[in-house]
Design a protein with these regions (language model features):
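Non-transmembrane, aqueous-exposed alpha-helical and coiled segments at domain scale
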Residues: 326-602
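Catalytic-core regions of core metabolic enzymes
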Residues: 1-334
Length: 602
């Protein structure tokens, strides 16, 4: 491995398995360091493509999303770092795929628990092809002022405190990702800061070793000293001992192998397998090889400070110019939660709330709806009228839904849905095709019937005055008239609704007025009977006014908005869906209207 610097201020990465927070932290670090281009060139999310919106400073940017590693590499040939956030189950396969890409030279594997056999194969391939693996089980790495991997170094506040926004003179490598944050802070306090920091990961077989990175740091002119933090267990530290003994490292190395707190990290590499793998043996071996090893972890900070100050006195470390990092704009959601800003909302909702443990309809929890045995009518009363209506009202709503659910295949709505379904269209297209026929001539006259009946009754018009007045205006009376029903063949649905209302409603004044209008219109023509639109419209007026739960203004608003037509739309959707399923189940062919049923004329 050896060689030298693996990251720079122009390094770009491909990020595998989209994770919003680590990517945003990388972009925030970029902005903090004054990078001109984002360090994340593309995202790989298997099976997906498109873009993900993230922030680069104050500017919102769109980062391309690719379905495969190959597609991402082809689209971003200058991106040479692969950051793998796959789970341990798929980390090995995706990492091997990345290693085989000619444009990628560094692969960081974040997942813990990668099988040892898979790790060995990855390491073997990487070494044979001059690639660098960081991990598995790593938090990543950082080159101060240039590039960082994922969640390395934590929050922006911690990065600023550790002065990672500009390069220092110390190369740092550790097994533990958790302890690396602590050491970044320590090093920033007593030196001019980190130049590069790497956490190799705590698994038994790391993709790159402590000595790999120390030898690499030794070749980087800007790195003047190195700090190593090892753990008991394994033999990785002994390769560093050999490198020191052989004189391969010419720069000061401060080292400590942690033994007392390794159990807290529970990493695979921290399992001691004998005396040679103990922290005491490793520390002594490093000390004997020429590393500066403190007597305890608590003394590590002072030893780092002494080593750095000695280099400064010898003139080996020029002063690092301090820079003031730019302020990272705070996310709106974070600022709102902290009470720092207020922002207007874009949608107002008063009928439901899904922010708690369970959705609430008009303030009624879902569990209450189920426990109390509420029906569809009760749910409609909550979501449409924002109140719990009496049972006779909600039962009337349910009756309307049942009676209007379907009226055979010959009416315009069902016909359209059938034709659309037979054309091979999907359920939603077939449903909408039928719904779009609902209007003044088919099912959409309920609101108008209620509107005109209410106006006439409230103004005290006689049926004669009402009907003749509508005639003079050239307006047909909504809710009156039927294509197949007549005086002698009444609509059974109308009769059922009227029967229910007589038995349960406290008042049926609007329905009685509509019946009087029907009596007058029947004197003109045998088919001018009350239809289901007229029955529902007049009876809904009686429901709204008789329940005592609505003001006159609310009733007028309900009719004006179109609530009552909504009832027909809801009900008839059941039948239209049924006709669609029926045609598909019967595997009916494309419909073509027969010639003999068309009058061809000039």
């Amino acid at each position: 491995m050896a060689t030298g610097q693996i990251f720079s201020k122009t390094t770009q990465a491909l990020f595998y398995n989209y994770k919003q927070l680590p990517i945003q932290r990388m972009l925030d670090f970029d902005f903090l360091c004054g990078r001109e281009t984002p360090s994340v060139a593309g995202i790989i999310n298997p099976g997906s493509d498109g873009f993900q919106k993230l922030f680069f400073g104050q500017e919102e940017i769109a980062i391309p999303v690719h379905p495969t590693i190959e597609a991402a590499c082809n689209a971003h040939p200058t991106a040479d770092v692969f950051i793998n956030f796959a789970s341990f189950r798929s980390a090995a396969a995706s990492s091997m795929s990345a290693l085989k890409q000619p444009t990628l030279r560094v692969v960081a594997i974040i997942a813990e628990g990668v099988p040892e056999s898979d790790a060995k194969q990855l390491i073997s391939y990487a070494r044979a092809n001059n690639k660098v693996i960081i991990g598995p089980a790593t938090v990543g790495g950082v080159q101060a002022g240039a590039f960082k991997i994922g969640d390395t170094a934590g929050t922006i506040d911690n990065i600023i405190q550790c002065k990672l926004y500009r390069p220092g003179s110390v190369g740092f490598v550790s097994k533990s990702g958790g302890m690396s944050n602590e050491l970044y802070n320590t090093i920033a306090r007593v030196t001019d800061g980190i130049y590069e920091g790497i956490a190799i990961g705590g698994d038994v077989f790391p993709g790159s070793t402590l000595s790999d990175h120390i030898l690499r740091f030794n070749n980087i002119p800007q790195v003047k000293m190195m700090v190593v933090l090892g753990e008991l267990g394994g033999s990785d530290e002994y390769s560093l001992v050999e490198a020191l003994k052989q004189g391969k490292v010419q720069k000061p190395v401060v080292a400590w192998v942690s033994g007392t707190c390794a159990r807290l990290f529970k990493s695979e590499g921290a399992k001691s397998g004998g005396e040679l793998e103990s922290a005491q043996s490793k520390n002594q071996a490093l000390r004997d090889a020429g590393a500066v090893v403190p007597t305890s972890f608590e003394a590590l900070e002072s030893v780092i400070k002494e080593t750095f100050e000695k280099l400064v006195e010898e003139g080996n470390i020029p002063p690092v110019p301090e820079v003031t990092p730019p302020l990272i704009p705070e996310d709106l959601n974070t600022a709102i939660k902290s009470g720092k800003v207020r922002a207007p909302t874009h949608i107002i909702s008063t009928i439901s709330d899904d922010r708690g443990e369970e959705p609430c309809y008009a303030g009624v929890p879902m569990s209450t709806i189920i426990e109390r045995g509420y029906g569809v009518g009760d749910v409609i009363s909550l979501l449409w009228f924002k109140r719990s209506l009496p049972r006779y009202c909600t039962q009337f709503i349910e009756i309307c839904v049942m009676l209007c659910a379907d009226h055979g295949p010959c009416v315009s709505g069902a016909h359209n849905s059938i034709v659309t379904a037979r054309a091979g269209k999907d359920l939603v297209s077939s449903l909408v095709s039928g719904l779009l026929t609902i209007g003044p001539r088919f099912g959409g006259a309920i609101d108008d019937a209620a509107r005109y009946f209410k106006d006439a009754y409230d103004r005290g018009l006689t049926p004669y005055e009402f009907v003749e007045g509508m005639k003079k205006k050239g307006i047909r009376v909504p809710g009156i008239g039927h294509r197949i029903k007549s005086r002698d063949n009444r609509d059974k649905r109308v009769q059922l609704l009227q029967k229910y209302a007589h038995a349960h409603f406290p008042s049926v004044k609007y329905m009685e007025y509509a019946v009087q209008v029907e009596t007058y219109t029947l004197s003109k023509a045998n088919n001018l009977v009350m239809n289901v639109d007229g029955a529902i419209g007049s009876l809904f007026l009686d429901l709204l006014s008789g329940s005592g739960m609505f003001s006159k203004q609310e009733i007028d608003e309900i009719i004006e908005i179109g609530y009552l037509n909504g009832l027909f739309v809801l009900a008839r959707s059941i039948g239209l869906i049924g006709h669609t399923f029926d045609q598909k189940r019967l595997k009916q062919p494309l419909y073509r209207h027969p010639w003999e049923d068309v009058l061809y004329t000039k």
